[in-house]
Every structure is written in C-alpha cells, then in structure tokens.
Amino acid sequence: MRASLAVLALIALTAGCGSATSPSKRSAPTPGSLQALWNQSEERVGLIPGTTDYSPGDLRISFLVVDHRGRVVAPPKARFWIARRLLNKPFWQTVARLENVGVPGVTTSEPVKALYVAHVRVPRAGTYWVLARPLGRVRIGGVTQVVVNEHSTSPAVGTRAFPSHTPTLATAHGRTSELTTRVPPDRGLLRYSIAESLTAHAPFVVTFATPRWCTSRTCGPVVDVVQAARRQFASSLVRFIHVEVYAGNDPRKGYNRWYREWHLRSEPWTFLIGADGRVKAKFAGSMSLRELAAAVRRFLL
C-alpha cells in the first residue's frame, strides 16, 4: 500500500524531525500559516491520500484522516487548507465533504466506507502542503504533500479517448470470468468496448478497476458505484464499461494492454467520455455515487 507507506514516512518526518516542520523553542510559526493552523490540533497526523495524479487547474483531492490508534476519523465535514509550504499562509481554504464510497446493500466488506473530498484550484505546477481538520469534538489535524505536475499522466480532460478494443461478452463468448473479477459479475458493464462506443458516438463511463486485487485502503468498491450509476441511468443513452487492469486478471502477469494504452499508473480510474470522443471528466481512486451521478448529468446527458 504505497500511499500508506508515504504517510508513515511523513509522520516520521513531522514527529522525529521537529525542526524541519514544527516550531522550535526559539521561534514560533507565522500566525495564520499552515504550520500554525496545524499546531492548533490536539492530535497531529499525516493524511492518507486517495489521489495523487494532479496537473494545474481544478483539483479533486481525496483523503482519509486516521488517528494514532489506526482509527478512521470521519465527521461529515472537514476544514481544508492548501499552501506552498508549511510555513506559508494558505492561498485557498474550503470545506471537504465526506463521500460514501460504497453502495448500500451491495458493498458490505469494505473497511473504509467513506473518504473526504476537497476541491481546490491550483494555478501552477509545484509541491504543495494541505491540512485537513475534521469538524467535531476530536481536535485532530492531518497534513500531507500534494505534487502538481505540469501534465497529468492519465488522459487529460478535453483530450480524445484512446480507441482501445477492450474485451466484451461477445468477444469472450460469454465467459465473464475472463472479463471481470467482480463476484457476481455485472453483465451490463461488459457489453460494450471503448472502440465500438467511440465509433458509435455514444457517451460512456469507463472504469479501469480490479475488484478482486485492489488492496489500497482508499481504492474502494468503484465497480459497485459504476454499476449503481448504470442502473440509475438505464433509460439514457449513456453506456457504462468496466475494464480490468491485469493481463488475464492475474497481477503476476502485469498490466494489460488497455491499461497501458491509456497511460495509467495507478488504479482505479474512471473516465466520462462524451459523444465527441473527448474526456469530459475523470475520477482517480474512489468516488461516491453522488459524485459520479452528478458528473454524468453535467457532462453526458
């Protein structure tokens, strides 16, 4: 779980090397700086990020807040700040909302039921610091670094979707085990390929995810959410597609060619593609049904 390892390193840095990130005995942080705001927390931790692929513009940042005992802290809202450095004053402040990443009655075994999601605007590439402080009785604050690259590694919003000839029920002769690791399989997500949908000028949602092999604490039941959205928009012309990420659905064989064609470096990823074949929106990692449904209404209907 790479995200968790990164956070453990961050916690070690902030706890063991106080002179780098915390005020010394001789000087206090500038009032209003991110460090000063963090110092107001009774318990200071590192955030567990759910998203990492960022480029300048509007950012959707998802994360978990976990206390020192390993317990998820999850009031409905959290105050959220972003700054260039810990000792700088934040240039953006907002409220992160807790989003349910499962589907009631469908998702039952996930240890994490919700993630915080914050929306901020970052004008240029660089390394930033963010602070989240859940609103509630427990005064806990979490920080982490956010690296904004010049360009996203995943397909950017506005670019043309790659016409991958992803497998379908027809090409697999109905053998669902070749197409999905989800149990039970949702055949409605396996009917169409990306290439055929682009040729038909059909708007669609495609998720690259592996229900069986996703091990990150923040990857969530993405296919369950996409299935629920498919049912919600069954009367529309929007198609919903699930693509596994490993060759032969076996992690030992590495990523499959469709995953590589889309230049993905993590999973899960969910993209909304318009009738014009261009990426309209995308979600890295987990998202809620509320978020996905709102995006479908805004961009695909």
Task: Locate the predicted segments by residue.
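Bacterial signal peptide processing site
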Residues: 17-21
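Contiguous segments within soluble domain cores/interaction surfaces
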Residues: 23-178
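Thiol-/selenol-based redox modules, centered on thioredoxin-like
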Residues: 169-170, 279-301
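Thioredoxin-like thiol-disulfide oxidoreductase module
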Residues: 242-267, 272-279, 297-300
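Loop/turn elements at helix/coil->beta-strand transitions in domains of secreted/extracellular proteins
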Residues: 201-205, 234-240, 267, 275
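Bacterial N-terminal signal peptides
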Residues: 6-15
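Short active-site neighborhood of thiol/selenol oxidoreductases, capturing the structured segment around
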Residues: 194-215
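Typically the conserved alpha-helix immediately C-terminal to a functionally engaged Cys/Sec
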Residues: 216-233
